[in-house]
Every structure is written in structure tokens, then in C-alpha cells.
Swiss-Prot record:
Belongs to the alanine racemase family. Pathway: Amino-acid biosynthesis; D-alanine biosynthesis; D-alanine from L-alanine: step 1/1. This is Alanine racemase. The active site is at residues 34, 254. Keywords: Isomerase, Pyridoxal phosphate. The modification N6-(pyridoxal phosphate)lysine is found at residue 34. GO terms for biological process: D-alanine biosynthetic process. The keyword Magnesium does not apply. It is an enzyme of class 5 (isomerase). Its cofactor is pyridoxal 5'-phosphate. CDD domains: PLPDE_III_AR_proteobact (cd06827).
């Protein structure tokens, strides 16, 4: 019997990419596969993301893993390179880079490279995390055009800070600023990530960058991915390793944080924070056992968590438990825990077995 296993539905992945294409038909797709494919497995996701025109990663190591696995499509470093010594690696492996600061620009100007690097100039349109400020934009464009180490034409991108908050004007302001700055430019542009392409169609430029939605997880609080026409790619399961009777008034788990109000049965499931399931999950967080939702009862420990199966439960050792997936949206679990689906799927540890199915696997 397996312990915790993440089942990855590659047909759902392909469905989701097709859905992105339906919603942004005029845009090319840069599938974002950073953080080990959002916890789904970098190489498997890239291999089966058939609708992707390019891939976006955060770290050069991720780009090199993709190249080593046989990926030949364009790859972009979304944070750019970290040091001048990275530039020859980009050239050798045909990796594109974001440029967002003076230090990166100077490194390009001073480098001696065999061939130019494809550069995306990142503009700070209002998030104020990475990117050149609007007043720096023209100077950066001019210097990049003059730099022999930069392939032409330049490309341009920015990132939204509040695209998941539909009642804010911030996204409209960022879009208008970016479009104004890049008006008349020769190169391709990218503005929309998941929330942008779903909710702000005016941000669907030459490229869109689906991340979390590609994995069937919604970027929005008020709508699940299923409601948006997407399918969950990951289903996280484990098994009951014990079913115990607990009397009214007895407490369960470390710290005695849950006390039974009745005689009941407690199920012990083989998954815990050592597998990446959050210790912060409170009492009442739902788990699915034999097709019904049951609440977490007691503190999540390193290797186990406990649920209240109810006094009349017929569940047995070895029965399956679903932590999130087809029958329990990860967005719902995240809401109970006070986090976001992104964090849950990316924090699974190496103890969790990955099992891929669908799409000819």
C-alpha cells in the first residue's frame, strides 16, 4: 500500500492548455513551469504541454533541466540572470532572459558573447517588485538596441499585482501604462498571466503566460478552476492506517486541540507536514474518505493527520483518503487553511510519490 501519492492527470493538463487557447486565441502561450512545474513535475509537465509555444521558468537550473530532458522550445528566465557568469550558459543553451535592472544591463554591455541573447525588457507598470520604472524605459530601450549582445528585436513584458482582484482599478492602470510605453515597438509583448488572461482580455497581447490555471487551480478567491472550465491536474491521496474509537470528552493529537463532543470514530491518514500538508490546517478542514467529506480533528503531525469519521462510520484500514483533487478543490482546502492553492501544490515534499496518467502515459 502506497503512502501519500500525487496523481497527475496529463489529459487535464492538455485540456487546460486548449482552454487557454480558446480564451486567448490571438496569443502565443508561454507555459510557466517554475517551482518544479508548480509541484507537478517539471519534466513531465513540459513533455506533455503540447499546446505551449514556449516555457517560463524562474531559475537557470530549471531551464537547464528542460534542455537536458530534450525540450527544444524557447525558454525564458522570468527573473532574468543572477550574475554575469550566467550569460555564456544562456548562449550555449539558447535560453532567453528578462532584463529588469541596471546591473543586468551593464553585464550585457560588458560581456563578450559568441552570439546575442534574446532579451525581454521588464517594465514596472505598478507592481513595484521587478522592472524598469517608466522614466527609465526609453534609456533602457536605447541601450539595449545599441548592445551587440542583445538579439533584435527586443521583447517587452510586465506583471500585474492585483489581477485577481476584479474590483480594483490597478490592473486597468497597469495595462494602459504598459501599452502606452510600448506603443509602436517592433518586438512582441506579454502582460497577462493566469488572472490577466482570464479576467482582463485587453491584456492578452502577443504572448500570455498561464501558470496556476494551467494546473487546474484558480487564481481567484471567489471562483474555482472548475467553474472557469478548467480541470484539476493534481489529486493528492493517501490511506487510512488506523480507525479508532474515541469517547466523548477525549482529545486527539498533539496539544489536545480537538476534543470529541460525542462517541465517534477517528481515522488516521498517512500524510502530514513532512509530506507538505500544512501543519496549520485547522480543525474542520475537509478531507474526502470513501466519497464523503470528513473534518480534520486534531493537529496535523509530521507523518499523520486525523479526521472525524463519525460514530456510524464503516471505513476500514487501507481505505483511500483524498486531500484535494477531483472531489475536493484545492482552492477550498486552501481557504480553510488561510493560504492559496499555489502554496499547497508547490510545497509537497519528495516523500510524496508522483504518479502520471493519461495522454498516452
Amino acid at each position: 500500500m502506497k503512502a501519500a501519492t500525487a496523481y497527475i492527470n496529463l489529459e487535464a493538463l492538455q485540456h487546460n492548455l486548449q482552454r487557454v487557447k480558446q480564451q486567448a486565441p490571438e496569443s502565443k502561450i508561454m507555459a510557466v513551469v517554475k517551482a518544479n512545474g508548480y509541484g507537478h513535475g517539471l519534466r513531465h509537465i513540459a513533455r506533455h504541454a503540447l499546446g505551449a509555444d514556449a516555457f517560463g521558468v524562474a531559475r537557470i537550473e530549471e531551464a537547464l533541466q528542460l534542455r537536458a530532458s530534450g525540450v527544444v522550445k524557447p525558454i525564458l528566465l522570468l527573473e532574468g540572470f543572477y550574475s554575469p557568469g550566467d550569460l555564456p550558459v544562456l548562449v550555449t543553451n539558447n535560453i532567453q532572459t528578462v532584463v529588469h535592472c541596471e546591473e543586468q544591463l551593464q553585464a550585457l554591455e560588458q560581456a563578450q558573447l559568441e552570439t546575442p541573447v534574446m532579451v525581454w525588457l521588464k517594465v514596472d507598470s505598478g507592481m513595484h517588485r521587478l522592472g524598469v520604472r517608466p522614466e527609465q524605459y526609453q534609456d533602457f530601450v536605447a541601450r539595449l538596441h545599441q548592445c551587440e549582445n542583445v538579439a533584435k528585436p527586443l521583447r517587452y513584458m510586465s506583471h500585474f499585482g492585483c489581477a485577481d482582484e476584479l474590483d480594483k482599478s490597478t490592473t486597468v492602470e497597469q495595462t494602459e501604462l504598459f501599452l502606452s510605453l510600448t506603443q509602436g515597438c517592433q518586438g512582441e509583448r506579454s502582460l497577462a498571466a493566469s488572472a490577466g488572461l482570464l479576467a482582463w482580455p485587453q491584456s492578452q497581447l502577443e504572448w500570455v503566460r498561464p501558470g496556476i490555471i494551467m494546473y487546474g487551480v484558480s487564481p481567484f478567491v471567489e471562483k474555482s478552476a472548475v467553474q472557469l472550465g478548467y480541470q484539476p491536474v493534481m489529486t493528492l491521496k493517501s490511506h487510512l492506517i488506523a480507525v479508532r474509537e474515541v469517547k466523548a470528552g477525549e482529545s486527539v493529537g498533539y496539544g489536545g486541540t480537538w476534543t470529541s463532543q460525542r462517541d465517534t470514530k477517528i481515522g488516521v491518514i498517512a500524510i502530514g507536514y513532512g509530506d507538505g500538508y500544512p501543519r496549520t490546517a485547522p480543525n474542520g478542514t475537509p478531507v474526502v474518505v470513501n466519497g464523503r467529506r470528513v473534518p480534520i480533528a486534531g493537529r496535523v503531525s509530521m507523518d499523520m493527520l486525523t479526521v472525524d469519521l463519525g460514530p456510524d462510520a464503516c471505513d476500514r484500514v487501507g481505505d483511500e483518503a483524498m486531500l484535494w483533487g477531483n472531489e475536493l478543490p484545492v482552492e477550498e482546502v486552501a481557504a480553510h487553511i488561510g493560504t492559496i492553492g499555489y502554496e499547497l501544490v508547490t510545497k509537497l515534499t519528495s516523500r510524496v510519490e508522483m504518479s502520471y496518467y493519461g495522454a498516452g502515459v
